[in-house]
Regions:
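Non-catalytic interaction-recognition regions
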Residues: 1-285
Length: 285
């Protein structure tokens, strides 16, 4: 759309009005040094083809003009030097570039049979995201990418992603969720209702208290994730929560002959199901 309505070239005109555009060697340059940056940058090549900086600049202007009050840009590490030019250009036109949050992601290495798959865009040898999703499924791909912070290199192990064992963090979490759901389903089959008046003081073992305390941290985890723009906080939290549940499950029966304790542990299990569902929903899984 920015090309069809010529907004990218209108952006050049706006920069010209600010004396931030000049021609050299047949190319159109952004006078970035006039805006306080270290080097001027080409916006339109001598061939007439725009560099990627120009549509990025026009796109941000368009977002500001449409009233967006916060923008989150996700760049690869190879664009580390590009985004300051984009922010500088829109700032020079009077837009508040502080409303743009830039996240720089490190690269991803795809591993198969323990070895990295060699990729080269020049040789058209690469794995697309679509191919990755076809190989292991969308939930696994999303979770593996979310697990790592933006500053951490990701080794995407295809064998691990397809492994149906506790070594696979997605399987580990899904297994906990399945166990919880099966307990709730079994209680329903036995006509045991969730009793909100259950005596929760009966939940006093270390594994139960650890699980309760961890669940209580969920709102803080969500807020911290929002504030830091680091969703790996949620995946780490959910993995730890699943770990606490597996420890609880290994030592305790939820449904037993002790009706009072059963009622209390069903409340605990139902609460855990809600937290797991909410966490997975936030992650889009």
């Amino acid at each position: 759309t920015l090309y069809k309505n010529r907004e990218i070239f209108n952006f050049i005109d706006k920069l010209k009005e600010k004396n931030l555009i000049y021609e050299k060697d047949g190319a159109t340059w952004f006078a970035a040094t006039n805006a306080g940056l270290k080097a001027d940058k080409v916006l339109i090549k001598s061939t007439g083809e725009p560099t990627y900086r120009l549509p990025d600049m026009a796109y941000h202007k368009d977002k500001f003009d449409r009233g967006y009050d916060i923008m989150i840009d996700v760049f690869g590490a190879d664009h580390m030097d590009a985004y300051p030019d984009v922010l500088s250009a829109v700032s020079e036109l009077g837009y508040d570039s502080s409303k743009v949050n830039v996240l720089i992601h490190q690269f991803v290495t795809i591993l198969k049979d323990g070895s990295p798959i060699k990729m080269s865009t020049r040789k058209a040898n690469f794995v697309t995201l679509e191919e990755l999703i076809d190989e292991v499924g969308p939930d696994v791909v999303r979770y593996f990418f979310i697990m790592r912070g933006t500053n951490t290199h990701l080794n995407f192990d295809l064998d691990l992603a397809k492994n149906q064992s506790d070594e696979n963090p997605v399987f580990y979490l899904q297994y906990a969720h399945a166990r919880v759901s099966n307990i709730i389903k079994r209680a329903s089959e036995l006509k045991i209702n969730i009793d909100k008046a259950a005596d929760l003081s009966l939940l006093n073992t270390d594994v139960e208290l650890n699980l309760i305390n961890k669940m209580n941290l969920f709102p803080d985890c969500i807020k911290r994730t929002h504030d830091t723009k680091e969703p790996q906080n949620i995946s780490t939290y959910l993995h730890d929560l699943a770990m606490y549940f597996h420890k609880f499950y290994a030592k305790n029966k939820v449904i037993s002959d002790d009706k009072s304790l059963t009622a209390s542990r069903l409340i605990l299990t139902k609460a855990l199901q809600i937290v797991l569902n909410n966490g997975l929903t936030v992650l889009g899984i």
